């Protein structure tokens, strides 16, 4: 038996690299459920085993009593689904079938997981030898830190979601929002308690970051109630597993469903709504919802659902509720399809609290520039809106991908908090507080760059006339050098028979 490795360092990447050998010819979108399902199975097995051994040590014979586990929000794992059984079958041709049966048994014993877990490990195209090797890897690494709610499996699940998003490109938009974007929404909204809602929740990232925020600030996760839904059945299942790993109780509806046509929470009035809806969604069914009660500020156009999502969220706001959402930049200024009028009505209703223009290249899934919209039913700064131009923030972590740093996120959150407190001073090129009347004078366009102005450049102290004289001299020298090089190139081309 290999020695158990309890180190957290690089564990997420280790799991990912090992699991990648399983892929073979399976599409990334299908393979995702295999990898994440296996992580989930190991997680619930480890939690169950820890409690099981605790009950054995007590000596009262309650180790097979299901109630002992459910009382502590631990999933009960029947005998044929325990990791010892999986591990023993790792190097047999039946390993896929054994895992599928384990998943079915766990679903049967835990109603919350009914029809959620993947049961496709026996498929012929999944290499059983490699599957056994990954099972071995999981067997030899302890996946939870006992007594610590911030377990390594949650991080691994999150890491693998990000890697799948990177692989799937545009398709990943259905289930993944970059962590730094979600953290920015959460740090601004600060959802300490109340009802938290995401109408297009993907894999549940908004809820996970909310729980992390609460933990980091010494709060209690039980002080929030989580509601969400998603129209993609695979993504909906990913969210259920993701939240279960984190110990987050959530109502995501009884099944996946279209938010516009089958609202799973029609009576909900939420305190915090966070979402990253599909950008510029066309063909969303506007013609069948023309008289919907949610369109208080105007009927959204058929070819773009951005303001349908926005108004759906406003409809679900509690009297003191707040929204933080991601929208494509077109929504800041578009006049087509009545969008300008809808935006005008929302602004005049004094709902727009803050707009943040985000940097480019934050998403694996799209190059469309985006902004964060923060709305509030009962704004503290009446008749005013904060504009933040954060386009220059962030650091390139790969050639194609940018991330906001902790410092960047905190700067945005601190700026917003100062605005709410009434202590913020405008900063040229970064932030400005603007009255609704001034926004009206700009035809209700919400592009931050229009209001924050251009960052002031430090004066280097060199007199203008001297600077221009120096620069024109340098330019003249460069022109002269250019002519010399041009003549030399012509001469060399002529020497080999190519005259210009």
Per-region residue spans from a language model:
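Non-catalytic, mostly N-terminal accessory regions of nucleic-acid modification and defense proteins
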Residues: 1-192, 251-264, 357-360, 382-398, ...
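Conserved Class I SAM-dependent methyltransferase catalytic core
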Residues: 14, 21, 30-43, 236, ...
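Short, contiguous acidic/charged loop-to-helix segments that flank catalytic cores in large enzymes
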Residues: 25, 284-304, 330-339, 359-364, ...
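Hydrophobic alpha-helical scaffolding
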Residues: 124, 146, 200, 228-232, ...
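Conserved S-adenosyl-L-methionine
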Residues: 171-275, 280-296, 328-330, 338-352, ...
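Hydrophobic alpha-helix feature that most strongly marks membrane-spanning transmembrane helices
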Residues: 215, 244, 248, 278, ...
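Active-site lining segments that contact anionic ligands and/or coordinate catalytic metals
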Residues: 269-270, 304-306, 320-322, 326-328, ...
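C-terminal, active-site-flanking charged/polar segments
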Residues: 351-352, 362-413
